[in-house]
Amino acid sequence: MALKKAPKLFKTFFHWKLWKFSIIVFVFLVFLFLLQREVGVQDFKDEAGIEPVVGKKSHVLGLVLNAMNNIKGAKPKMQIKAPIRQTKVPGERHCLPGHYTPVELKPFLDRPLQDPNAPGASGKAFKTINLNSEEQKEKQAGEEKHCFNAFASDRISLHRDLGPDTRPPECIEQKFKRCPPLPTTSIIIVFHNEAWSTLLRTVHSVMYTSPAILLKEIILVDDASVDEYLHDKLDEYVKQFQIVKVVRQKERKGLITARLLGASVATGETLTFLDAHCECFYGWLEPLLARIAENPVAVVSPDIASIDLNTFEFSKPSPYGHSHNRGNFDWSLSFGWESLPKHENKRRKDETYPIRTPTFAGGLFSISKDYFEYIGSYDEEMEIWGGENIEMSFRVWQCGGQLEIMPCSVVGHVFRSKSPHTFPKGTQVITRNQVRLAEVWMDEYKEIFYRRNTEAAKIVKQKTFGDISKRIDLRQRLQCKNFTWYLSNVYPEAYVPDLNPLFSGYLKNIGNRMCLDVGENNHGGKPLIMYSCHGLGGNQKELCLHASKGPVQLRECTYKGQKTFAVGEEQWLHQKDQTLYNEALHMCLTGNGEHPSLASCNPSDPFQKWIFGQND
């Protein structure tokens, strides 16, 4: 009897085990479906969203585990644990390991093939020679209007390429990590009565060289242009590119306000500002955005190449690298360039390393949008243009950020010898802007600037530089460092004049009643001249009076700041008898003749007597 029932019992037991196994599989599949749905729909954009999601997952897991463990006799028992999630940094996006591939960094648009013999092809010069009378008139009109050869630009393709990638090998071979991911960017281009060809070549250049996954949009900000072709015609042209938008200021407010308008409508994670007459070289964008991903408080500029204003030849980078420059400032608060100090060259291992710069030109740079807003964007009370780049340079460094130049990022720019634009209220707005930055950021060192610029001193005395209380509050809120810290830590090479000098101002000769003057286009290495005293200041080149047996010359000062010394030829004694005595050559300065020179000291000679006078 027992033997007859055995097959039936075995069959019943087998069905029971199969039933339990089916339940296990079903419950496990339900668990996977719920878990996948939770992961798929939840976008981990901020830390606040992590806890509820993890809680939901834990609840689902608990139900599943309890159900499975309550099924007695199920073998083997299954132990399921939720995957351990790594701690998430606020603001960090989900990213994959490894590096971006060339396919992932494919440009937004493919550049059309060009005729290698076309005007300006491959970035070559287009020389306008043998023009007929009509062409000559057109060329002259373009130069007068735009201060560059618009005739040449108009005949160069909007789509021209720049030939082979001639950057150093480490730039061409540079890989970019997927984690943290490269941020998206909004390109902001401000224009006012810009030439059609230079503006549109800038736009096309961006689209042909910027990865599609990084290029969020191109925002063209019209600062009240009056040229008709920049209105409906421009709007119609950019309709073919959904990524390009035009916003307009109804009245001329200048670069600063226009950039703030562009930033206010931008949706990218970073902002990239370009001028309206640029061309971007291969791989220009990735190094800028990679540096911001690595250091969100870095404000980064490309290596700016020159586009010749006459021929539009693009000065391409060298594959062997080259000596770089960085930004500086003088005590007239003008921007300039200088070669890198030895310690900065030593710090950098190759061309992929950023260059730290005390100031930046301010026309071409990228910055995190969040950081741009946090650090105070631009001073909204500054007018039109001028001084905003020096102000931002001081502010970024003093408030915990840093300015850098990325040599592997190359952007060409048409450098003009003068501006084609007039400014409402004239150039006084620039001086007013400079006074605002000096009052907020320079502490006691602002007095050096006021001694150099009589117009600035008047603005301060009359208190016509506007309300700066918001900018002072910003400095206090961000707990920014003082200007002494900036000079000591960011720019120790700067020449800092005495805060309380024994003498300052113009240097007037008693004999001819004329003043010592730099003269035109004297950037060092040329003699000085005697010129009618005007008391306007200007021409402050941070150069030194260098004694020699012929006419004395202006030369680059051997005194460079801390731990440096001036050579004897640049050390002068203003003696009680009003002579200027050079100890190295034991001679005195005379103003007799076309150029000041040295002569045997004669205290009775009125041409050897000099007095300092304050600028009016």
From Swiss-Prot:
State the name under which the record lists this protein: Polypeptide N-acetylgalactosaminyltransferase 3
List where the protein spans the membrane: 13-33
Naming one, the record's GO cellular component terms include:
Golgi cisterna membrane
Residue numbers spanned by region Catalytic subdomain A: 182-291
Domain notes for this protein: There are two conserved domains in the glycosyltransferase region: the N-terminal domain (domain A, also called GT1 motif), which is probably involved in manganese coordination and substrate binding and the C-terminal domain (domain B, also called Gal/GalNAc-T motif), which is probably involved in catalytic reaction and UDP-Gal binding. The ricin B-type lectin domain binds to GalNAc and contributes to the glycopeptide specificity. Essential for glycosylation of FGF23.
Q: Name one Pfam family in it.
A: Glycos_transf_2
Q: Which GO terms describe its biological process?
A: protein O-linked glycosylation via threonine
Tell me the GO molecular function terms. Answer: carbohydrate binding; manganese ion binding; polypeptide N-acetylgalactosaminyltransferase activity
Tell me the ranges covered by the Ricin B-type lectin domain, including all copies: 512-616
Protein family per UniProt: Belongs to the glycosyltransferase 2 family. GalNAc-T subfamily.
Q: Which cofactor does it need?
A: Mn(2+)
Q: Tell me the residue numbers annotated for binding Mn(2+).
A: 275, 277, 413
Q: Which residues are glycosylated?
A: 482
Role: Catalyzes the initial reaction in O-linked oligosaccharide biosynthesis, the transfer of an N-acetyl-D-galactosamine residue to a serine or threonine residue on the protein receptor. Glycosylates FGF23.
Q: Which domain of life is it from?
A: Eukaryota
